[in-house]
Amino acid sequence: LSGNEEASLLKFFNYKEFVDSESLLVDVGGGSTELYLCDKNEEKLKSFNLGAVRILKGLDKEKNWQELSNFLANINSEQIQNIIGIGGNARQIIQAAGVLKDSLNLEELQEIRSRLGKLSLEEKISDYNFPSDRADIIEHATNIFEYILLCFENAKFFASNWNISDGYIFKKNAEISQATSLEVS
């Protein structure tokens, strides 16, 4: 799937618990970051060539960060109350915060990033039970979420159990349902 196709799958995310507040959905993957905002007036979605593995390998470029910054600047900062992280990186960040946390403010996210930055790969695995394929990139994923949260300082960061693959399944089910209803009529 292309990055924009991945971003479009975020619209299938069911976020009933956040229905009364504006939310920005963010999926930080290894090679890209997808954002989706749907408010009463418009839908915005975009994929950026910024991912945790790209940063780890030094492949992130200033122009990619600038594209993300420009996209975020076109969203009313007072409007967003929730940054909902999609996927494993977001869940691992919340896990690092502790058992009783379900959301983080900017200061808490920055503290976690700082703490993770001081740990070796082995310590991240043993202390936080991070999978080995996630332990080396989690700090970089946290950097991306922090960058976004800096634009929406009043927002809280949440992690969802949902993944992009769930969006793909919901999309396919919707297509099948639509095709079936057309056959019946």
Language-model-derived ranges and their functions:
Residues 25:
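Conserved SAM-binding loop
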Residues 1-22, 36-185:
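Helical "lid/coupling" subdomains associated with nucleotide-phosphate turnover
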Residues 28-32:
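Active-site-adjacent helix-turn-beta-strand microarchitecture at beta-sheet edges
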